[in-house]
Amino acid sequence: MLRNCAMRLRTLGATPARRPGAARRLFSSEKVIRKDYALPNPSWTKDLRLLFDQFMKKCEDGSWKRMPSHRQNPTRAIQEFQTLFVDSKFKKEEQMSKAQQFTRSFEEGLGFEYAMFYNKVEKRTVSLFQGGLHLQGVPGFVHGGAIATIIDVTTGTCAISEGVAMTANLNITYKKPIPLLSVVVVNSQLQKIEGRKLFVSCTIQSIDEKTLYTEATALFIKLDPEKPLT
């Protein structure tokens, strides 16, 4: 899955994001402020808010960093990625400017509600995830494809800390179904690097760590600017 590599690479060294709010334009600088969807909203349950606050405490000493998350890619990031990796005959800048991140394309509370935190020293990324009602598979439970998506997003953040990368393989073992609207912890860690190959492990557990819902391993490949994707 192609992800917003350029934006996330900047984010790993970025300053904390602003509080949520509709995108607006500042008259002084004409700079657009985009809404950060990785901050609490009214659809978040008490459990998700509590976990979020706990991880924000961990961020205070600098060991963890909260990852901002936006609905649309910055235009500059799109242009940079296409310049490096996309053949000119496939570039559609006007259409791409209207593209949205899949996990942030749902109405509030209906899809992927999550906040992501990154630890550079431990090479870990943790997502606090609440699956909304429009992610249903078997009645009452989160669809397996939605679970795979949040795994891909979380492990991908681990991988791109080492450079622009794309998913090559996801190996997922579903152990227990995840109830809709429940809160789970998606914990991923970069295990090893072999050349351009990045190997990442991942688990999904209940917030009390007593239930293991899913185990996964992922392989990502660092992209070579000398080799276009198309």
From Swiss-Prot:
Q: How is the polypeptide modified once translated?
A: Phosphorylated.
The record's Pfam families line, in alphabetical order, gives: 4HBT (PF03061)
What the record says about disrupting the gene is: No visible phenotype. Mice have abnormally elongated mitochondria, but mitochondrial function appears to be normal.
Binding residue positions for substrate: 175, 196-197
Q: Does the keyword Ribosomal protein apply?
A: no
Reaction catalysed by this enzyme: hexadecanoyl-CoA + H2O = hexadecanoate + CoA + H(+); octanoyl-CoA + H2O = octanoate + CoA + H(+); decanoyl-CoA + H2O = decanoate + CoA + H(+); dodecanoyl-CoA + H2O = dodecanoate + CoA + H(+)
Q: How does it assemble?
A: Homodimer and homotetramer. Interacts with AKT1 in the cytosol.
Q: What is this protein called?
A: Acyl-coenzyme A thioesterase THEM4
